[in-house]
Swiss-Prot record:
It comes from Alkalilimnicola ehrlichii (strain ATCC BAA-1101 / DSM 17681 / MLHE-1). Disulfide bonds: none annotated. This is Large ribosomal subunit protein uL13. One of its GO terms (cellular component) is cytosolic large ribosomal subunit. Keywords: Ribonucleoprotein, Ribosomal protein. HAMAP family: Ribosomal_uL13. The keyword Ribonucleoprotein applies. GO terms for biological process: negative regulation of translation; translation. This protein is one of the early assembly proteins of the 50S ribosomal subunit, although it is not seen to bind rRNA by itself. It is important during the early stages of 50S assembly. The keyword Ribosomal protein applies. Belongs to the universal ribosomal protein uL13 family. The lineage of its organism: Bacteria, Pseudomonadati, Pseudomonadota, Gammaproteobacteria, Chromatiales. Part of the 50S ribosomal subunit.
Length: 142
């Protein structure tokens, strides 16, 4: 018997909606990354994007443990000397709550062309409403 290898045209992708209200950031992000990669499917193939679409709602209500709300920092460099920008979790969750989940999940995906394709299947919304009702996403309990 030959080893099965999924082909990109044969992959069936489902849509799921996840409520982030009260969930811990890292635990939610690891489960979302796992499903974006498609590792929960029996036809998972490492070199093919077999993952599902994930819609995360209520990103503004995500929780972190301990003092991470004030201590956790997000850094970015503009490319110019001395231009390292830093922002705390508290300020980022007020300014752009979607970015917190996007950055956490992106850090758990492969750092290559396949990882960039996987992150495009993640849709994050600050509030409880999303605009993907036409895809009929199934609720996913994490």
């Amino acid at each position: 018997m030959k080893t099965y290898s999924a082909k990109p045209a044969d992959v069936q992708r489902d849509w799921y909606v996840v409520d982030a209200n009260g969930k811990t950031l890292g635990r939610l992000a690891s489960e979302v990354a796992y499903r974006l990669r498609g590792k929960h499917k029996p036809e998972y193939t490492p070199h093919v994007d077999t993952g599902d679409y994930i819609v995360v709602v209520n990103a503004e209500k995500i929780a972190v443990t301990g003092n991470k709300a004030s201590d956790k920092m997000y850094h970015q460099h503009t490319g110019y000397i001395g231009n390292m920008k830093s922002i705390s979790f508290e300020k980022l969750i007020d300014k752009a709550p979607e970015r917190v989940i996007e950055k956490a999940v992106k850090g758990m995906l492969p750092k290559n062309r396949l990882g960039r394709a996987m992150i495009k299947k993640l849709k994050v919304y600050a509030g409880g409403e999303h605009r993907h009702a036409a895809q009929q996403p199934q609720p996913l309990d994490i």
